[in-house]
């Protein structure tokens, strides 16, 4: 059976001397992997369409196991990701998070649209770090994680938020922050932005500017929460941390 899908290449794996296994996150089928025979050869008709982050239409011969990529038509090469190491790093993080958390052939048009929109904004020059924070935040309910962003995790009141508690699963107000000795102190902007990112429509994203200190706090909150409740290891996250450490 042949299946035509619109999708984005989120992972490629070399297979033998000339072949690739490409993992595509598609609008129609969710995540699907296929063998791209001969794709490593420069003159192959599959060479360009099997590049990481390529957005296109793909014709896949489906089987009981791994499918076969028969042909592809490029919508966008998203070449910006091959021209900037920072964009490459953040795009890889987005794609790896999507890959790790999406089951094969699980239809999820919402996640496809979010993936496409995030990568598109990156190509347009929107702050990739902010976009990665938005994506991480919006992935929480997709993964079944619903931290307390609107109220205090203990008293459930909408009040002054001064810390984030991984143990309690959300923000803490000034009255209850002392109940978790491992709480993460946060500024008011961190709470407001995480709550905004969690709820707002990504299509409505306008000009966005966030202080470096605020982004650092948000990253700490999200990474610590993911580590506790999600338990996945992302190579791309490690690379981002190295870029930040050495200020490359």
UniProtKB/Swiss-Prot annotation:
Signal sequence range: none
UniProt keyword annotations, A-Z: DNA damage, DNA recombination, DNA repair
The keyword tRNA-binding belongs to this UniProt entry's keyword annotation: no
Any one annotated GO CC term: bacterial nucleoid
GO biological process assignments: DNA recombination; double-strand break repair
UniProt entry tagged with the keyword Coiled coil: no
Pfam families: RecO_C, RecO_N
NCBIfam families referenced in this protein's UniProt entry, alphabetically: reco
Function description: Involved in DNA repair and RecF pathway recombination.
Family: Belongs to the RecO family.
Record protein name field: DNA repair protein RecO
Gene that specifies this protein: recO
């Amino acid at each position: 059976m042949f299946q035509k899908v619109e999708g984005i290449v989120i992972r490629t794996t070399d297979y033998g001397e000339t072949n690739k296994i490409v993992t595509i996150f598609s609008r129609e089928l969710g995540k699907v992997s296929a063998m791209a025979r001969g794709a490593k050869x420069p003159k192959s008709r599959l060479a360009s369409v099997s590049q990481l982050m390529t957005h296109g239409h793909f014709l896949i011969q489906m089987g009981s196991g791994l499918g076969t990529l028969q042909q592809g038509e490029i919508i966008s090469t998203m070449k910006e990701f091959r021209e900037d190491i920072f964009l490459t790093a953040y795009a890889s993080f987005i794609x790896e998070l999507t890959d790790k958390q999406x089951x094969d052939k699980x239809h999820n048009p919402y996640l496809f649209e979010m993936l496409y929109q995030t990568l598109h904004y990156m190509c347009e020059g929107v702050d990739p770090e902010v976009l990665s924070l938005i994506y991480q935040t919006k992935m929480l309910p997709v993964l079944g994680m619903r931290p307390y962003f609107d109220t205090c995790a203990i008293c459930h009141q909408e009040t002054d938020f001064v810390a984030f508690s991984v143990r309690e699963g959300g923000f803490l107000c000034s009255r209850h922050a002392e109940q978790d000795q491992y709480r993460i102190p946060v500024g008011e902007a961190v709470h407001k932005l995480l709550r905004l990112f969690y709820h707002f429509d990504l299509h409505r994203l306008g000009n966005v500017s966030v202080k470096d200190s605020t982004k650092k706090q948000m990253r700490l909150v999200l990474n610590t929460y993911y580590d506790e409740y999600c338990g996945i290891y992302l190579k791309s996250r490690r690379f981002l941390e190295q870029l930040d450490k050495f200020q490359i």
